[in-house]
Amino acid sequence: MKYVVVSGGVISGIGKGVLASSTGMLLKTLGLKVTSIKIDPYMNIDAGTMSPLEHGECFVLNDGGETDLDLGNYERYLNVTLTKDHNITTGKIYSHVIAKERKGDYLGKTVQIVPHLTNAIQEWIERVSRIPVDNTGMEPDVCIIELGGTVGDIESAPFVEALRQFQFRVGKENFALIHVSLVPVIHGEQKTKPTQAAIKDLRSLGLVPDMIACRCSETLEKGVIEKIAMFCHVGADQVVNVHDVNSTYHVPLLLLEQKMINYLHQRLQLQEITLSSEDIQRGENLLSKWKSMTGNFDSSMETVKIALVGKYTNLKDSYLSVIKALEHSSMKCRRKLEIMWVEATDLEPETQDTEKAKFHEAWNKVSTADGILVPGGFGSRGTEGMMLASRWARENHIPFLGVCLGLQIATIEFARNVLGVKEGNSAEFFPELDESNQVVVFMPEIDKETMGGSMRLGLRPTYFQQGTEWCAIKKLYGSAESVEERHRHRYEINPNFIERLEEHGLMFVGRDETNKRCEIFEMKDHPFFVATQYHPEYTSKVLDPSKPFLGLVAASSGILDDVIAGKYEFNGDGKSDF
């Protein structure tokens, strides 16, 4: 097993996740099987109860794990399926060690950070790195480990020490370290001092970088690269210029141009790994398709405008998987994506009274959009604005996709304005609401007291109902009888309303294994009015976009029938089939 650690200095949020994912993707183009582990040095057990406005999106895995959004990047770039154990947090590892101490596993010893916690971290990495994550079912060849936060922070100290020990545990030829650092541009001059200081701190902790990935807003000058190499005690070929590009999907090709993969091949002695001709061919096909996809991104001419009506729009990372699913879909449809961010509260009548400019700007975006998306969320704030956007899409035949809360919002709006249930709402927003008006209800099996990990989580099946051959969403899924998608919710559509809703044209075409819980609806006689209780964005891949999102973008571009017919596929020669 080979290990590539990606750490960061100077500041957090510098792009370690994208660089780690891109490095893994390039290793896959060699035919290698790659897995990933993310280390998050916070005390939370997982990301499930964190505010999206503080931490960004909570990414849900097949096994129901609620994790850091970077695991979404790994799954999208590497086309793998990770587990909750691929996300190590301080809370998890401390809980693990304390549980072992309580069981008596340490035989009365004084349990300390070193060696007990650091050993536990190393053992965790070794165990999880061997879990098969792709469709081959075989043990991975390489594990990418991203160390979250900034090296030197007190929170990450135990993990840094564990990795220092780990390099000797696995052997130098099996361990490589890439350190990501910032090269700011001040008054037109590229400054290297922050990188020099970051590498000095890293070396003082016992970790020596094999490569330094320099993040900069512009291409690094040759003299700057040579200066960093000299003062950081590495060769010039070990300094990688990761400047800003049009899209993060170009980063793997940027690294490829700078021969990063050649250096890692030599440094980790990758020639020792036995690969079949099928493995090598699969890697070559991946690189060819990736170039095709990025070519589509660069050559896309027509713009498709999607209004994203949400409640966490102040931090775009709150909807990272949604954004990526839209990007994947737009690249497949050969369209340039324009996301128009709409804060849901700005659509509500109260805003017209207090902030008219915001109100009119928000409605201008909604009314001029090619398609409307209402994503997931929690709480009542902004829900009336979301309902107004849903109604606009329904009545004006604008393509619409609702996800999780979006499905519930669209159903409530339909019940109010089509069924005449004027007081219809969700038990989440108004727990004391009369049962006759509860369009959305609390799921009976869910724990009302415990917040963490208590939702309906993870991969679950959805079955298409009989007589649904007409619906676009089923066709997008290849007319499959059932699909498996990831869930994260506590509330569901009230089964008592389903018959009335369907009588008026809102058809619940997909349900769970009990045939009672509604998973997908689609409206008849509408270009595309679809919503899902599950989160399809979590399984969207760069070369295999999420089907509901693909449907939204295709319908918004006027090419839904062509996409369903398979006329927009990557063929590996830099162009799509269409």
Swiss-Prot record:
Q: Which organism is it from?
A: Candida glabrata (strain ATCC 2001 / BCRC 20586 / JCM 3761 / NBRC 0622 / NRRL Y-65 / CBS 138)
Q: What does this protein do, in the record's words?
A: Catalyzes the ATP-dependent amination of UTP to CTP with either L-glutamine or ammonia as the source of nitrogen.
Q: Which reaction is recorded as catalysed by this protein?
A: UTP + L-glutamine + ATP + H2O = CTP + L-glutamate + ADP + phosphate + 2 H(+)
The organism's lineage is: Eukaryota, Fungi, Dikarya, Ascomycota, Saccharomycotina
Entry's Gene Ontology molecular function annotations:
ATP binding; CTP synthase activity; identical protein binding
Glutamine amidotransferase type-1 domain location is 305-559
- The protein here is known as CTP synthase
Name the source's superkingdom: Eukaryota
The EC designation for this entry is 6.3.4.2
